[in-house]
């Protein structure tokens, strides 16, 4: 039995969407990279990109044979969080539910600690 605690949850909905987006690409090594940058109305901002590189120190989480990659600097702000994919009246997007954020902006794409 594996008791290793995964610091971020990569939901089935997010993994399914990543899988559908990369199926049309000619690169089986693509993964979703989530990262934190300075900016946004609350001080920090979430970013998402597709990446086929895994750098030293990156955390990789697999779900449904697709990967989520987080760099060490961003990981410290995302521990305990969830990367999800939502569809609703305000559109469809990848979202981060972050228990470390003391406040978030209305659109949910930036936060403060």
Swiss-Prot record:
Organism source for this protein? Actinobacillus pleuropneumoniae serotype 7 (strain AP76)
The terms describing its cellular component in GO are: cytosol
Q: Name one GO biological process term.
A: iron-sulfur cluster assembly
Q: How does it assemble?
A: Homodimer.
> Does Metal-binding count among this protein's keywords?
yes
Q: What is this protein called?
A: Iron-sulfur cluster insertion protein ErpA
Family of this protein: Belongs to the HesB/IscA family.
One molecular function GO term is: iron ion binding
**What Pfam families would the database entry show?**
Fe-S_biosyn
Tell me which UniProt keywords the record has, alphabetically.
Answer: Iron, Iron-sulfur, Metal-binding
Kindly list the cofactors needed: iron-sulfur cluster
The record's InterPro entries line, in alphabetical order, gives: FeS_biogenesis, FeS_cluster_insertion, FeS_cluster_insertion_CS, FeS_cluster_insertion_RrpA, HesB-like_dom_sf
Q: Which PROSITE patterns match?
A: HESB
Question: What does the cofactor section's free text say about binding?
Answer: Binds 1 iron-sulfur cluster per subunit.
Q: Which residues bind iron-sulfur cluster?
A: 41, 105, 107
- Organism lineage: Bacteria, Pseudomonadati, Pseudomonadota, Gammaproteobacteria, Pasteurellales
Top-level lineage group: Bacteria
Role played = Required for insertion of 4Fe-4S clusters for at least IspG.
């Amino acid at each position: 039995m594996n008791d290793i605690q995964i610091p971020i949850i990569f939901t089935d909905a997010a993994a399914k969407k990543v899988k559908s987006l990369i199926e049309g690409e000619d690169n089986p090594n693509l993964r979703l990279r989530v990262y934190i940058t300075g900016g946004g109305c609350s001080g920090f901002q979430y970013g998402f990109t597709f990446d086929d590189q895994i750098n030293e120190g990156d955390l990789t989480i697999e779900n449904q044979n697709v990967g989520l990659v987080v760099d060490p600097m961003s990981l410290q702000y995302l521990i305990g969080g969830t990367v999800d994919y939502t569809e609703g009246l305000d559109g469809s997007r990848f979202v981060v539910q972050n228990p470390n954020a003391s406040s978030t902006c209305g659109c949910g794409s930036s936060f403060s600690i």
